[in-house]
Amino acid sequence: NVSMVLQNLGVESTALGFTAGFVGDEICRLLQEKGCHTAFMTLPEGCSRINVKLKSADGTEINARGPVITEEALQHLMQKLDMLEKGDVLVLAGSIPTGLPATIYQDILHRLASREILTVVDATGNLLCNVLEHHPFLIKPNHHELGEIFDVTIDDMEKVKIYAGKLQEQGARNVLV
């Protein structure tokens, strides 16, 4: 989704991550059809996950389970991340796939810390909070996620400002709610 939005805005990017099965093939095809660059690692087993959002009063979500990421695949990802250069922007988005450590976002930000790579993190809960010590350039909690972090209800702009400010105090350079 990030690469599609950037492409629509005329910004060149490369979609990077893991794909598997017919869903992974379709993801690659759709991105390339829209002119997006891809550098996915294709896994030999499993199927890329599909997330379904149902428009209803309760906003039901159905999140399928994706493929298991092997240590070998993780090392391949890290090698690709090592190719990033000063001034590049890395977006880490979503939940952690099966097989990766719960600290993977922290590990990646730590690995890139000295290289002046701008990082954007779109994640929830501890996955988001645990990267703050690495001073990501931008984090993007929605107002529900922001409230969950601080165990409060965010129901007006004043609370958004207060609690987004608290995330900045904890290390985020910019917070987009």
Model-identified regions with their sequence ranges:
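Short, small-residue-enriched loops and turns at beta-alpha junctions
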Residues: 67-70, 96-100, 127-129, 148
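Conserved phosphate/ATP/ADP-binding segment of small-molecule kinases
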Residues: 106-119, 123-177
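Conserved phosphate-binding/catalytic loop of the ribokinase/pfkB sugar-kinase fold
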Residues: 43, 53-86
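Active-site core of PLP-dependent enzymes with the aminotransferase class I/II
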Residues: 99-107
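Short acidic/histidine-rich motifs immediately flanking catalytic phosphotransfer sites
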Residues: 84-89, 135
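A structural signal for isolated positions on well-ordered beta-strands in alpha/beta enzyme cores
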Residues: 14-16, 39, 91, 120, ...
